[in-house]
Regions:
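Hydrophobic transmembrane alpha-helices and immediately adjacent juxtamembrane helices
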Residues: 1-276
Length: 276
């Protein structure tokens, strides 16, 4: 008697076909489900719940304002230091949390990966997407601070979606690399906190990139988050220098990380179920 069950044959592929973007789109409902699951699990049995999305960048801003703004008197491009720092910490927190979640996503979903076939790219992507809720809450506080300081956005705010996209692309690109490596080498999860801490101070969050010359700023933009942070300040706070070259270099680097990470992830994917 013929069977009505569907048989999925997984074959190796090369080039752009190996990314299987069409297949990824077909599993978009699973992507939504896993992202929503991550959001609920994150604040399960917590007293403050989603308030942590605001507390983390806010108290970091307070610490930076005391030590860098008051004591070290670091310049802030003519802006009040608290909002100068917070405007950078909002996108940074989205990136750092997305990176941390994505790097451990495959190991955390080991049981599902071993039992069910689906595009494994769904796992780190959903981990990064789940941080959007936290980002929106922190961004609302940033808008409130802008009103408090009497800072009105200019037409530059129309560029803001580009910088949000760059956060997502950078977190996803690095997340692809780290999540795949973490399956093979569990030491990766211990290095991620050090990586994000180093990256924090290698990004112009507590200080402006204007401390560097124009030439060095362009080289500095090899760090994709430089373009994101300076772009956020320019779009929302109206800093004087339009970071055109910085954004271009950072965007190029971010998409290079994404494409390279996706290909590496796909190449390692065939061994995930056996190793994880």
């Amino acid at each position: 008697m013929p069977s009505d069950s569907q048989v999925i044959v997984v074959k190796p592929s090369k080039g752009w076909i190996s990314l299987k973007l069409k297949e990824l789109w077909e599993y978009r409902e699973l992507l939504y489900f896993m992202a929503w699951r991550d959001i609920k699990v994150r604040y399960k049995q917590t007293v403050l719940g989603a308030a942590w999305a605001i507390i983390q960048p806010f108290f970091t801003m307070v610490v930076f304002s005391i030590f860098f703004g008051k004591l070290a008197r670091v310049p802030s491009d003519g802006l009040p230091y608290p909002i100068f720092a917070f405007a950078a910490l909002v996108p940074w927190t989205f990136f750092a949390n997305g990176l941390n979640q994505a790097s451990n996503s495959l190991v955390g979903s080991a049981n599902l990966i071993k039992k069910v076939y689906f595009p494994r790219l769904v796992v780190p992507i959903s981990s990064v997407i789940s941080g959007v809720v936290d980002f929106v809450l922190a961004f609302a506080v940033l808008l409130g601070m802008m009103l408090f300081y009497g800072i009105l956005p200019t037409v530059n705010i129309l560029w803001l979606p580009l910088f949000v996209l760059l956060i997502f692309v950078t977190a996803l690109g690095v997340g692809f690399w780290l999540s795949a490596l973490n399956v093979q080498f569990r030491d990766v999860r211990y290095t991620v906190p050090f990586l994000t801490q180093f990256w924090l101070f290698a990004t112009p969050i507590a200080y402006p990139s204007s401390l560097l010359s124009e030439t060095w700023r362009t080289i500095y933009a090899i760090n994709p988050m430089v373009g994101v942070v300076e772009g956020f300040r320019w779009a929302l706070l109206g800093t004087d220098t339009a970071p055109g070259a910085i954004i271009f270099v950072s965007s190029l680097m971010a998409f290079s990380l994404l494409v390279g990470g996706a290909f590496y992830f796909r190449r390692m994917e065939r061994s995930f179920a056996d190793v994880v």
